[in-house]
Every structure is written in structure tokens, then in C-alpha cells.
Amino acid sequence: ATPDGTCVRDYVHVADLARSHVAAAKRLAAGTPIAPVYNLGSGTGLSVREIMSATSRVTGIDFEPGINPRRPGDPAVIVADGSLAARDLDWRMRHTVDEMVRSAWEALRAADSAAPHETKDSL
């Protein structure tokens, strides 16, 4: 079970992921051994409802998400233990959930404004 009944997942900002790749590449280039796999995450995760609350807060759009039952076989909680990446790569998440949502929202708005829009005359 989860605190609010929705699945908990570990969300990571793409910039934080990119920093981990750079840190690993620098270690490899220096000839320093690294682990074959690094899990990247907060170790705690956020529920789907918490992500939806952050989305509403950041975008200013008030909405009530429709929450469906968990799919068969879908784990209630999946989070990553980033302690190995912290130790070897000095990696930690820097971005908060609000920053992640804001970044995604701004990218979506920029892509939408750059896309050609149909007009009545072009139909």
C-alpha cells in the first residue's frame, strides 16, 4: 500500500541524469574503474497523486485527476537506491519535483508555440 493509494515511482530530472553520464565518462577517461550499473534516484519516490499536485501547482491549472486501479502485476512502489552513484560519482539529485514539472511544462509550451498551427483557411 502507498500513502495515498497511487503508485510511487522515483522521478529524476533529465539534467540530473545527464550529470551522471558526464561524471561516469570523466571517471572512465581518467582510467578510474566504475560499477557496471548505477541506479539513479531519490530513494524515496513520489506518488502519482503527488506528481499531479505538483503539476497543478506549477502550471496553475486546477484539475482533479482520474485515478484508475493499479494494473495487475504493477508494483505499488519502485524507487532507486542511488547510494553507489553518490559514492562513486558524487551524484545526487539536484532538481525538486516542482523544478522537474516546470521544466517539462516550459518545454511543452515552447514546442507547442513552435509547431505550425492549422487555421480555418488551411483546412
Residue ranges, per PLM feature:
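C-terminal substrate-binding subdomain of Rossmann-fold SDR/epimerase-dehydratase oxidoreductases
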Residues: A1-L123
